[in-house]
UniProtKB/Swiss-Prot annotation:
Keywords: ATP-binding, Cytoplasm, Kinase, Nucleotide-binding, Transferase
Organism: Geobacillus stearothermophilus (Bacillus stearothermophilus)
Signal peptide: none
The protein's Enzyme Commission number: 2.7.2.7
KW Ubl conjugation (keyword) present: no
Protein name from the UniProt record: Probable butyrate kinase
Reaction(s) the record says it catalyses: butanoate + ATP = butanoyl phosphate + ADP
InterPro entries: Aliphatic_acid_kinase_CS, ATPase_NBD
GO MF annotation list: ATP binding; butyrate kinase activity
Keyword ATP-binding: yes
Cell compartments where the protein resides: Cytoplasm
């Protein structure tokens, strides 16, 4: 029986960086950190 493969996109926004990952099941395929100034998102209301 063939194992199912799942692709998962994760996005973790933070105050000084945003982390992005693509996983196939539990294995990371792509991981990237994008750094930005905290004030970029200062005007966003929660």
């Amino acid at each position: 029986m063939q194992e199912q493969k799942f692709r998962i996109l994760t996005i973790n926004p933070g105050s000084t960086s945003t982390k992005i990952g693509v996983f196939e099941n539990e294995r990371a395929i792509v991981e990237k950190t994008i750094r930005h100034e905290g004030r970029c998102f200062g005007n966003i209301k929660r």
